[in-house]
Every structure is written in structure tokens, then in C-alpha cells.
Amino acid sequence: GSGSDYFRDQSNGVFNLTFDVAGPVMMPENYAYYGSNIPYDDANVRTMLTTALNAIDADTDFSRYDWNGDGEVEQVFFIYAGLGEANGGDENTVWPHKSIISNQGVTLDGMTVNTYACSAECQPIYQGGYVVDTHIDGIGTICHEFSHCLGLPDMYDTDYAGSGGEGYGMGAWDLMSSGSYNGNGFHPACYTGAERMWIGW
């Protein structure tokens, strides 16, 4: 199914989300410029996103995405080419995440665009422990990152040190833990009951 199918199912029909697709946009710089690591972030990922937003502005009416009339687009979702650093990409690729562009955001069509989430286009094919090829990613990471826009936290060991991070979660049984990778991302886990309650579903 699609991301729309996932959210419709998890909300018992309450949340009927549709995605409008714009692009693709060719970036003027290479992966390393945008994705090289700095402490707790990628170097110029927000420059990448702002460049993409400006490139699609002429063909996109951003006012359509202000769902509550507050002058701000609720969120935008970016899918960037290639692998992500969380799954097969090297340190020069972008880590899938949810964040804001800046303290002020970007103004397009009179709307502030600020909250965003992003994930990679592809996932790796491994052979002998090495990435030998890629194929299209499933919906799992998209659903996981978009769920942060809905207010859900990560439910896995976010410092990867066995400390529990924000929480050990339920592993493959929970989208917000490692369940986004089930079936190569094509069969992501459901939300837990607590997560549905958190969102109001």
C-alpha cells in the first residue's frame, strides 16, 4: 500500500492524507556538501531543502497546505535521491529526520514553510556485507518520519549505546521503533495503542 493507505488504516479512517508530488529538482552541489556530518546534524541539509522549495515555487501554491489558517504550511516531506545515512549511505549522505528549516522558515506564496521531514529514495542491496546496488525504498521510513510531524517521538535506542535513549520501544512491532524497516519498508509495523492515543486516534 501507500503512505496514504497506512495513515488511513492506522487512524481507522479518521486521517485521509494525500501527498501532492512536485519535482524532481536537481541540486547544484554534491552529496557531501549537503550531507557531510557536523555534530548532531548534516552540514547543509536545510540549504538543500530551501533550494528545492524555491525551485518548485512557480508550480506550487503553498497556500493550499495551510490546514488551519495560521499562515504556515503544516509540513512538507522531501524524498532525496539515493541512500540515506541511516540505511546503507555513507557519512556524506543525509540522515532521514524531521526538523525545521530555521527559526523563521521560508516565505512562499505568503505562507511560512518551516516544518519538514525527509527520507531517502533508495535502500541498499547487500552482498557479502557490502552495498552492491540499490532499489526503491518502501513506505516505512516515510511513515516513521511523517509521524514525527504528527507529534510522535522515536521509540528506539536513539544514542545506540544500549542506554535506552528515549526508549527501547517494541522493536519490529512498532513503527516508531525498528518496525519501519519491516519487509524492506514495504510492510511497516502498526502504531502501538499508546501512540494512537497520543495522536487522538
Predicted regions and their residues:
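Active-site-proximal segments of metallohydrolase catalytic domains
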Residues: 1-111
